[in-house]
Amino acid sequence: MLIDWILKNIMDMDQEDQSGKTQWTKYYLTVYFSGLFNFLMILILSVLFGTLSETFIVYVVLIFLRPVAGGWHAKTKWLCRLESIVIYVAIPFVLKNSSVSLPFIYKILLICLLVVLFYWYAPQGTAIEPVQPSDLNVLKKQSLIRVCLLILCSLFVKEKIASVILYGLVIQGLMILPVTKNLIEGSVFMKFGKKIIKNVIEKRVAKVSDGVGTKPRLNQNSPNIFGQWMGQTEKPKKNIEK
């Protein structure tokens, strides 16, 4: 692993050392390289899909707001990468190739809603990065100032760019809403994904066990979709009790 190699050969640290300095160095390197990987992945995808300018604008908006407004984080690296692709590439791609635009009155309503949302919920801390009570008012003021600056910028640029700026504001707004916490962190996907996978496996196991004691045909009820190329696995001798 690259991080372990750096710790051993560059930082001259023992990987098994549990001291604070070693653990914090490892934590820093893990966060740094994870962020670098995500950045390069998004950069490559934005070039491939032709959304480099839109992706850059969204990235700047979130980098500008997130340090003061806070917000939820995905609980796993893979979910973080998936959400990053959707936020930085997929939706900007749709915005770029869409001819639909919000009427002026709806934009005004959206802007007012965003200001209220940031006033009410920013800054939003997490279990890992809680907001200190002494910093609450300062961060709230900074959040509102930065939101207003971005809104002001959106009034003096082209329609497409303004739409992307507002989109970035909406995304950051969703990241601080309490109702979106489970969605962004991935708890919703984990809950329903676990349930779906469990049901599928249970049905397959029940189907396989029903054929025990009979002469099976080639790959009949095989749990392995690649069974005819990868060989067969011996089935249990007893049926599962119903």
Curated annotation (Swiss-Prot):
Keyword Calcium recorded: no
Pfam family, any one: AgrB
GO molecular function: peptidase activity
GO CC annotation terms, alphabetical: plasma membrane
Domain of life the protein comes from: Bacteria
Entry annotated with the keyword Hydrolase: yes
Membrane topology classification: Multi-pass membrane protein
An individual GO BP term: quorum sensing
SMART domains: AgrB (SM00793)
Compartmental location: Cell membrane
Protein name according to UniProt: Protein FsrB
The species this protein was found in: Enterococcus faecalis (strain ATCC 47077 / OG1RF)
Gene: fsrB
